[in-house]
Amino acid sequence: MGYPTGRRRVSIFVDGANMFYTQKKGLGWFFDPAKLLRVLREDDQLTDAYWYMGLKQPPDPRDENFVRFLAYAGYVVRTKGLKTIYDSETGETTQKANLDVEIVMDMFNTVNNYDKAILLSGDGDFERALELLRSRGKELCVVSTQNWIAAELRMAVGSHFLDLQELRDKIERTDRGPAPEKPVTESPGVGQ
């Protein structure tokens, strides 16, 4: 398909919670969100990049710094307060902020702004949304890891799957942990 500018218009949608656990448990290393954005938009015209994440209430200062870092790097950050979920069988509680609906809403509300959607998630709940986007003529790519992607999501995109392991040398963080250690003003920008 030829594009008027010679480059595809691309929007990126990052399921932050899914990517956190993919990195922590699936990869054993963390990527730098600014480096990731540079790599994913390399040959294309970036129209939007969204990062979705749950926040403790009140927000933890590290989370607030990470949100500022993401915005500085070029992401539109969508947040939702974490909810406590009680499991009556085990008596355990977990905290969760499900942003799947927000991701799909943004995918469809901005559908005329991009030619290609890149989803960073391994969550099979996105299978139907991707099928509908494909029926509207959109190119799709899912970024995750082989071991942390639902089979139905992997099958929905076929060869349009990118394994984070293949990008490690370009996107791996060189500092510790998933949140920036330095103030936002010292974090590298997307264009640097």
Predicted regions and their residues:
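Terminal and domain-boundary accessory regions
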Residues: 1-192
